[in-house]
Amino acid sequence: MLYIFDLGNVIVDIDFNRVLGAWSDLTRIPLASLKKSFHMGEAFHQHERGEISDEAFAEALCHEMALPLSYEQFSHGWQAVFVALRPEVIAIMHKLREQGHRVVVLSNTNRLHTTFWPEEYPEIRDAADHIYLSQDLGMRKPEARIYQHVLQAEGFSPSDTVFFDDNADNIEGANQLGITSILVKDKTTIPDYFAKVLC
């Protein structure tokens, strides 16, 4: 079997309120105001596909949100999104590999974040056979082509694949291809799913 794990709020807890909090501290703009103006628009998607640079993304978002931040200040806040690793998921990934399954990570991410989390959480790379990142592939979830790329690269059919993600749109995109897709609602979803399988 091929098991595909998303990264944020699946393997690692993330919280965009921490990003906004850091920017609020730096700019003195109230957090409530930043929450209203923050949305994951086209610049966000372009950045995740690697179509625009980190600097262009920072400039676009600062413009959209009227943030008077330097690139360094923007980056500092952007890295604050990461909270903590989910060790129970890392343990499951290792167990699956020990049983002969293929385990990969598929994440919509960007270069700003990949300068941080691989060093901060080396356990992720150790637990996965391969890591697929949207910025490297030039495509992002829930686009069908990104799932098809992973299936083809790994040599698995949709019927022999299980996908875990915390985003309902991403789950729907994978479901449409016939991939068994599990919406991760909280920290118990993945351990509960494997409770009987990995006894």
Curated annotation (Swiss-Prot):
CDD domains: HAD_sEH-N_like. It comes from the Bacteria. Is proposed to be a useful catalyst for hydrolytic transformation (e.g. removal) of alpha-Glc-1-P from complex substrate solutions containing multiple sugar phosphates. It holds the Pfam family Hydrolase. Magnesium. Can also use other divalent metal cations such as manganese, cobalt or zinc. Substrate binds at residues 6-8, 107-108, 141, 166. Mg(2+) binds at residues 6, 166. Its cofactor is Mg(2+); Mn(2+); Co(2+); Zn(2+). Belongs to the HAD-like hydrolase superfamily. YihX family. This is Alpha-D-glucose 1-phosphate phosphatase YihX. It comes from Escherichia coli (strain K12).
